[in-house]
């Protein structure tokens, strides 16, 4: 699904701390450097790609949203830092074996035909190449809050029975194409956002899984959720933040 409406706040809801972003760039560039051209699907505003490009990784970025790509160009100083393509991850506009590697962060759970997207990645990345995939990492209470919200208002139409933080089904899909799997070292991150702030974002409709819900119903659901969360955890603003681990899987293709 295109993220046109999220352009101006996307980085605020998906960004990492400077320390975690640097560690992620070091980790990914160590896997990608020397492999040749790398494709990132769902490149968005360049949260992953811009630091990788600065680290010397040759890239092509693809996204369904032209406004997101325009924001990437703006962040890069007004000129495309590498080739950018508006396109669909399930029908990649590239010939077979065009790339040596691919990067996928927080994308597959948004793609109804996500297994087709996996097949397309396997098609366009050459044998001996590499696909790096990361799902979402959020503190455990965020999972519970999100699930309870969806139980109240219904699942979004793009829901694909693949949670944003799930990796097991993705691993199985790549293995079905003969890929070998490696789990890369975890990157520690501390989420400073409180539950109250997360609920504020939910009420404001900043997350894709809230976009199909009528505003009045959304705000009523979040108001109920706040009361429930206080009963469940006692406070929506615990001190010190919460620790999460950023996980990447490497799929070596044959």
Name what the model sees in each region.
Residues 162-177:
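Short alpha-helix
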Residues 106-110:
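Short catalytic micro-motifs in class I SAM-dependent methyltransferases
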Residues 17, 45, 180-254:
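Conserved Class I S-adenosyl-L-methionine
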Residues 1-36, 47-51, 68-71, 75, 130-161:
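Conserved class I S-adenosyl-L-methionine
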Residues 115-127:
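A short glycine-rich, Lys/Arg-flanked "PGG" loop and its adjoining helix->strand segment in the class I
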Residues 103:
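A conserved beta-strand element that flanks and buttresses the S-adenosyl-L-methionine
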């Amino acid at each position: 699904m295109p993220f046109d409406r999220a352009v101006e706040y996307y980085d605020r809801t998906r960004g990492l701390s400077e320390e975690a972003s640097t560690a992620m760039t070091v980790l990914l560039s160590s896997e990608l450097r020397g492999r040749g051209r790398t494709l990132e699907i769902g490149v968005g505003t360049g949260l992953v790609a811009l630091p990788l490009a600065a680290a010397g990784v040759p890239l092509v970025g693809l996204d369904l949203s032209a406004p997101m790509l325009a924001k990437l160009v703006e962040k890069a100083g007004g000129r495309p830092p590498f080739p950018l393509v508006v396109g669909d991850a399930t029908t990649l506009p590239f010939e077979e074996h065009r790339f040596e590697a691919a990067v996928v962060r927080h994308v597959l759970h948004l793609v109804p035909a996500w297994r087709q997207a996996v097949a397309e990645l396997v098609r366009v990345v050459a044998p001996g190449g590499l696909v790096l995939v990361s799902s979402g990492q959020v503190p455990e209470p965020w999972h519970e809050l999100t699930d309870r919200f969806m139980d109240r208002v219904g699942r979004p139409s793009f829901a694909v029975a693949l949670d944003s933080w799930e990796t097991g089904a993705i691993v199985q899909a790549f293995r079905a194409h003969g890929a070998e799997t490696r789990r890369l070292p975890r990157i520690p991150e501390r989420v400073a956002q409180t539950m109250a702030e997360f609920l504020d974002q939910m009420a404001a409709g900043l997350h894709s899984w809230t976009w199909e819900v009528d505003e009045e119903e959304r705000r009523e659901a979040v108001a109920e959720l706040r009361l429930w969360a206080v009963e469940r955890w006692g406070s929506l603003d615990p001190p010190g933040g919460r620790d999460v681990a950023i996980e990447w899987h490497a799929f070596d293709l044959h």
